[in-house]
Amino acid sequence: MIPQVVTSETVAMISPNGMSLPQTDKPQPFHQWQDSLKKHLKAEIKVMAAIQIMCAVMVLSLGIILASVPSNLHFTSVFSVLLKSGYPFIGALFFIVSGILSIVTETKSTKILVDSSLTLNILSVSFAFMGIIIISVSLAGLHPASEQCLQSKELRPTEYHYYQFLDRNECFAAKSVLAGVFSLMLISTMLELGLAVLTAMLWWKQSHSNIPGNVMFLPHSSNNDSNMESKVLCNPSYEEQLVC
């Protein structure tokens, strides 16, 4: 191999076929594209991870509110399936951990962290799908529960019509509050689904954008230390470079 002089920072690619040094006086479109992709990923992942954490906190808070609601004969069965599934708690914790790990991975991108973030976001997509289905079923069950509540109030004898009117208002109020809680939880879950899909796609691009092989950066040396020699070992598939 002919010795080469490194006049600027050079990227040496070590592959099974040997080491190759690109020409320093020519632009490196692939590396420029890779750097641009990484900057784009960092900017987007930070924002999406922050929104993902906020939506998860919203789902968790609404789940705690539902769990603390006193038992009701007609409406408890509507959200009991949602609470028993554990989605407002387990799913929200999954989203929070996924968002935090995305921020950590954006700061320190290693293959293990990237693969872990990709896996967690794929699992978050599954949890979000499950949450959307359960919340939609709960929303659909509000109207029958409200009708049963109104019928029970009408059948109950009251001395004054005024008190019966107040009892009917309790049914409407319970339906309105639960509809608001379910709607907020559904919107947050749909946002989580979209963010998890986008983040998983970004991490997938990140994990597949690296070139196989080791990358070695050769810094610019002084004028006195500008000679480079190459030593080829007996194995032709291995090359070693020494900076003298």
Curated annotation (Swiss-Prot):
Keywords: Membrane, Receptor, Transmembrane, Transmembrane helix. May be involved in signal transduction as a component of a multimeric receptor complex. Belongs to the MS4A family. It holds the Pfam family CD20. Disulfide bonds: none annotated. The gene is Ms4a6b. This is Membrane-spanning 4-domains subfamily A member 6B. Residues 1-46, 106-121, 198-244 are cytoplasmic. It is a multi-pass membrane protein. GO terms for cellular component: membrane. The keyword Transmembrane helix applies. The chain crosses the membrane at residues 47-67, 85-105, 122-142, 177-197. Residues 68-84, 143-176 are extracellular. InterPro entries: CD20-like, MS4A. It is found in: Membrane.
